[in-house]
Swiss-Prot record:
It comes from the Eukaryota. It comes from Pneumocystis carinii. The lineage of its organism: Eukaryota, Fungi, Dikarya, Ascomycota, Taphrinomycotina. This is Cytochrome c oxidase subunit 2. GO terms for cellular component: mitochondrial inner membrane. Its main location: mitochondrion.
């Protein structure tokens, strides 16, 4: 049996994406790779033309009479970028539409940004006292971390969600602008006071996914981590029963 280790948190000197756990995230990575491929082609092509021209005409004093004007060249360098932008725009717009679409979520979780912590509310469920399940989530101080926990990324209360279930997050704030961002799930949404923003996701595998507030919100901006733990439906229902 093969054990696969997923990268669901920032790593030192990391230069690429974290491992994905949602369809939207996979689409983001695929679009990035496609655009990067196009950019490399442009870089190589333009660099080749530039350096070949420099090497050919350096110091010779020769001026080609057709280099002052060429309808063919102007047509090529006008149409080629237009076609390239169209090739990038269509998959980009498609992905943006899919990211904004919320289709019949099974669970809705409200995330509220504060200076400097997050609070969460499971509006669809109630605790033993008949109140909506809600809690605050603060960053764990360094001295309280256990072995294997991540500094400035671990919290005292994680958001628990079931895998393979349509989820919706409703995001807002009470004071200043914040930003709810979980890279491995492809989530990044502004948390604005007096405004409700929403985003849907579908977690494909169990794991612990780390994020942070991604909007400069004050002196303790870096102390607003987000931790989403995806578990099986059975474990999630058991957690609900214990609330």
């Amino acid at each position: 049996m093969n054990n696969i280790i997923h990268n669901d948190a920032p790593t030192p000197w990391g230069i690429y994406f974290q491992d994905g756990a949602s369809p939207v995230y996979d689409g983001i990575v695929e679009l990035h790779d496609q655009v990067l491929f196009y950019l490399l082609i442009v870089l190589v092509g333009v660099s080749w033309i530039l350096f070949s021209t420099i090497l050919r005409f350096r110091g010779s004093g020769i001026v080609h009479k057709y280099h002052n004007h060429s309808t063919t060249i102007e047509f090529v360098w006008t149409v080629s970028p237009a076609l390239l932008l169209i090739a990038i725009a269509f998959p980009s717009f498609k992905l943006l539409y899919l990211m904004d679409e919320v289709i019949d979520p099974s669970i809705t979780i409200k995330a509220i940004g504060h200076q400097w912590y997050w609070s969460y509310e499971y509006s669809d469920y109630t605790d033993k006292e008949g109140q909506s399940i809600e809690f605050d989530s603060y960053m764990l101080p360094t001295e309280d971390l256990e072995e294997g926990q991540l500094r400035q990324l671990e919290v005292d209360n994680r958001v628990l969600v079931p895998v393979n279930t349509p989820l919706r997050f409703i995001i807002t704030a009470t004071d200043v602008l914040h930003d709810f961002a979980v890279p491995s799930l492809g989530i990044k949404v502004d948390a604005s006071p007096g405004r409700l923003n929403q985003v849907s996701t579908y977690v494909q595998r169990e794991g612990v996914y780390y994020g942070q507030c991604s909007e400069l919100c004050g002196v303790l901006h870096s102390s607003m981590p987000i931790v989403i733990e995806a578990v099986s439906l059975e474990k999630f229902l058991s957690w609900l029963d214990n609330q």
